[in-house]
Every structure is written in C-alpha cells, then in structure tokens.
UniProtKB/Swiss-Prot annotation:
Family stated for the protein in its record: Belongs to the GrpE family.
One cellular-component annotation, GO: cytosol
Record Pfam families: GrpE
Biased composition (Basic and acidic residues): 1-12
GO molecular function: adenyl-nucleotide exchange factor activity; protein homodimerization activity; protein-folding chaperone binding; unfolded protein binding
Compartment(s) where it occurs, according to its Swiss-Prot or TrEMBL record: Cytoplasm
Gene that this polypeptide is encoded by: grpE
Protein task: Participates actively in the response to hyperosmotic and heat shock by preventing the aggregation of stress-denatured proteins, in association with DnaK and GrpE. It is the nucleotide exchange factor for DnaK and may function as a thermosensor. Unfolded proteins bind initially to DnaJ; upon interaction with the DnaJ-bound protein, DnaK hydrolyzes its bound ATP, resulting in the formation of a stable complex. GrpE releases ADP from DnaK; ATP binding to DnaK triggers the release of the substrate protein, thus completing the reaction cycle.
Protein name in the entry: Protein GrpE
The keyword Secreted is annotated on this UniProt entry: no
SUPFAM superfamilies named among the record's database cross-references: Coiled-coil domain of nucleotide exchange factor GrpE, Head domain of nucleotide exchange factor GrpE
Assembly notes: Homodimer.
Length: 185
C-alpha cells in the first residue's frame, strides 16, 4: 500500500511537472500569437497609410499640374489688362482693337477660371499678408488703416494655393502733426 501511495505521488508530481510545462508552452504560444496579430495590424495600418499618401500625392499632382504653366501665362494677362487701361474707349482708331483685346482677355480669364485659377484683386479690402505683398504705405484718413488703397498687380490663386501675391499700396493712419517749438513751451 505504501508503494501504491508513492507511485501515485510520483505520478502526481510528473503530471504537475508536465502540466506546468504545457501551461508555460501555451502561454508562450499565446504571447507569440498576440505579437503576430499586433504585427499584422500594424502592417495593414502601414499599407493603408501608404495608399492614402499615394492617393493624396496623385490628387495634388492633378490639382497643381498647371501651376508652372499658369504662372507663365500671368504676364500675358497683365499685358492685356495694361493695354486696356492705356487705351481710350472714345478713340475711333483703337476702338475695334480695344474690343478685340477685351474679348481676348475675357475668353482668357474664363478659360483660366475653368481650371480654378482665380484673380486676387483686393482693392478696398483689409490687407492680408497671406495673399498681398505691400509695395508701399500711404497715409489716408478716409479709409481704415491697413486697407488696400491701390493694386499695382493682381495676385492669383490656383485651387486655393497662392500662385502670385497681389502687389498693393496699403493705407496707414495719418501721423499726428509734430508740435512746433512754440507749442512745446
């Protein structure tokens, strides 16, 4: 009987040892499985990020592909506008030429508008350093300080991105008159 009890104890110890080894192995495998799942999720997330970035790059390429071309056309628009500004509508000798230039400019502007190229003509608006470049400041009591008084050259936006800033004259508040020597005393 004592031998049977010893055998049972040995079997229990062996089973416990084998059970501990199996439990340890199961825990290791569960940890490996969790790590593999985490790695797979990270790989999927990385793939989605790469795909999203590629789509954004393609979208930007389509959206701003005309940027250089549009920049090169802006001096042509400026020249047509300058021709209209310096020609007289009453002069019979240039009336037909002026009408042709007006139509050409209108067609040109309509075409550029179709491709989301917008003019920035800020006359009378508050100065915006993101879209305007101040060429000079001028005292003026009739308008709010930091308002655009004059536009030397229109600016342009392509799909909301600044292509060229508007060159402007900005108002400033009139300076107070310097007191004379007699007023100081």
């Amino acid at each position: 009987m004592a031998d049977e009890q010893l055998n049972e104890k040995d079997l229990n110890v062996e089973e416990t040892g084998a059970g501990n080894a199996a439990d340890t192995r199961v825990l290791e495998l569960e940890e490996q499985l969790a790590a593999a799942k985490d790695q797979a999720l990270r790989a999927v997330a990385d793939l989605q990020n790469v795909r999203r970035r590629a789509e954004q790059d393609v979208e930007k390429a389509h959206k701003f592909a005309l940027e250089k071309f549009s920049s090169d056309l802006l001096p042509v628009i400026d020249s047509l506008e300058l021709a209209l500004a310096h020609s007289s509508a009453e002069d019979e000798h240039v009336k037909q030429i002026r009408e042709g230039v007006e139509l050409t400019l209108k067609m040109f502007q309509d075409t550029l508008k179709r491709y989301n190229l917008e003019a920035v003509d800020p006359h009378g608006q508050p100065f915006n350093p993101e879209h305007h470049q101040a060429m000079a400041m001028q005292e003026n009591a009739e308008v709010e300080p930091n308002s655009v008084l004059n536009v030397f050259q229109k600016g342009y936006l392509l799909n909301g991105r600044l292509l060229r800033p508007a060159m402007v004259v900005v108002s400033k508040a009139p300076s107070a008159a310097q007191p004379s020597i007699n007023e100081k005393a």
